[in-house]
């Protein structure tokens, strides 16, 4: 959690690892064994389910829900309300 900000009401469960200079916003849920890289922003109400890997400099929008055990690459943007069921490569914008 070095130099990271965890906002009011965010929940970070067992064995989750948060990189440097991240923002974990209000009412976000980071489940067990999640790894979040450096310089990431997890927006309000996002749910990152167990064993997900989030690359460096990635933005996860408000209300995003991820399936367990997926990987999100570096420098990616996941837009508001997306439901991620598969891996996302680096440098990708996911928007419906």
Region locations from a protein language model:
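Extended, small-residue-rich solenoid/repeat segments and analogous flexible loops
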Residues: 1-27
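Glycine-rich hexapeptide-repeat left-handed beta-helix
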Residues: 26, 35-38, 43-96
């Amino acid at each position: 959690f070095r130099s990271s900000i965890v906002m009011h009401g965010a929940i970070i469960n067992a064995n989750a690892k948060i990189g440097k200079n991240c923002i974990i916003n209000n009412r976000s849920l980071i489940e067990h064994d999640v790894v979040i890289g450096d310089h990431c922003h997890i927006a309000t109400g996002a749910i990152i389910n167990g064993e997900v890997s989030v690359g460096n400099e990635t933005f996860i929008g408000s209300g995003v829900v991820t399936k367990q055990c997926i990987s999100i690459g570096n420098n990616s943007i996941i837009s508001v309300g997306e439901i991620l069921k598969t891996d996302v490569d680096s440098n990708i914008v996911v928007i419906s």
